[in-house]
C-alpha cells in the first residue's frame, strides 16, 4: 500500500498510488496529525513530495516559514515511516540543495561542498537536512529509504502565480496577460542562466522505478 504526501501538488498528482493526502487531510508539521495519517492508512511504501514551495519571490519573502514548515514536515514524515515500519520511502529533495558556486556537471557527491544560493537558502538547508536524516536512518536503523533530487519540474497542476510560482507557469501566465492586455512581456533576470526542466509525468515514471528497484545510499538526480 503506497501513500503519497503532497497528493494535490505538481508531482503528487502525476503519481499513481493507493492513497494521496494533501494539506487538507493533515498538517504534516503537526506530529499528532502525522501519527493519525499513519494509524489510518498503515502504508508499506511512502513517496514524500509534500512541502511548502514556491518560486523566487516566495522564497525571498517567506524565508522563516519555508525553513520551519519544511524542517517539520520532513522530520515528522521520515520519523513516522521508521516508527510504522514503512518498507520503502522515496523522499523528494530539490536541486537547490547544491552549492551556489560548484563545478559542473553536478553529481550527488557535491551537495555539501558549499553553501546554497542566498535567494532560497532556508528552503535549501531544510531539504538538505531531509537527505541527512535519510542517510542517518539508513546507517542506524538499516532502512531502505532513498532521496531523489529532481531538476526543475513543470506540468499540470503547477503554481501559475506570477509572484510566487515556478518559472515555466509564471512565464506562461505573464505571456497570457501581456497578450490579453496588449502590454509588454516582462521576464526577470538577465536571460543568460541555463535552466533545466523535466515533465511531471516523466518524474512519475522514474519514481515508480525507484520505488521498486533503487536501493543505493546516495541520492539520485532526476534529470
Residue ranges and their predicted role:
Residues 27, 97-99, 122, 146-170, ...:
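Flexible, glycine-rich beta-alpha linker
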Residues 66-74, 90, 126-127:
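Short alpha-helix in the Rossmann-fold core of NAD(P)-dependent oxidoreductases
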Residues 76, 118-151, 167-181:
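Active-site Tyr-X1-5-Lys
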Residues 75-120, 146:
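Conserved Rossmann-fold NAD(P)-dependent oxidoreductase catalytic core, especially the SDR/UDP-sugar
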Residues 102, 141, 153-170, 180-184, ...:
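Glycine/proline-rich active-site loop of Rossmann-fold NAD(P)-dependent oxidoreductases
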Residues 28-70, 80-83:
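NAD(P)H-binding glycine-rich loop region in Rossmannoid oxidoreductase-like domains
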Amino acid at each position: 500500500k503506497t501513500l503519497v504526501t503532497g497528493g494535490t501538488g505538481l508531482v503528487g498528482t502525476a503519481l499513481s498510488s493507493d492513497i494521496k493526502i494533501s494539506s487538507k487531510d493533515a498538517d504534516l508539521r503537526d506530529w499528532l496529525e502525522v501519527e493519525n495519517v499513519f494509524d489510518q492508512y498503515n502504508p508499506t511504501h511512502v513517496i514524500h513530495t509534500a512541502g511548502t514551495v514556491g518560486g523566487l519571490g516566495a522564497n525571498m519573502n517567506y524565508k522563516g516559514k519555508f525553513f520551519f514548515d519544511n524542517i517539520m514536515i520532513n522530520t515528522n514524515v521520515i520519523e513516522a515511516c521508521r516508527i510504522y515500519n514503512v518498507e520503502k520511502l522515496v523522499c523528494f529533495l530539490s536541486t537547490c540543495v547544491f552549492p551556489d558556486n560548484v563545478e559542473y556537471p553536478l553529481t550527488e557527491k557535491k551537495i555539501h561542498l558549499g553553501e546554497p544560493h542566498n535567494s532560497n537558502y532556508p528552503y535549501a538547508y531544510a531539504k538538505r537536512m531531509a537527505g541527512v536524516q535519510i542517510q542517518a536512518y539508513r546507517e542506524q536503523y538499516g532502512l531502505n529509504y532513498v532521496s531523489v533530487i529532481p531538476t526543475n519540474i513543470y506540468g499540470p497542476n503547477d503554481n501559475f502565480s506570477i509572484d510566487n510560482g515556478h518559472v515555466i507557469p509564471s512565464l506562461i501566465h505573464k505571456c497570457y496577460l501581456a497578450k490579453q492586455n496588449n502590454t509588454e512581456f516582462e521576464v526577470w533576470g538577465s536571460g543568460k542562466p541555463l535552466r533545466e526542466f523535466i515533465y511531471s509525468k516523466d518524474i512519475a515514471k522514474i519514481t515508480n522505478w525507484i520505488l521498486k528497484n533503487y536501493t543505493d545510499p546516495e541520492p539520485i538526480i532526476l534529470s
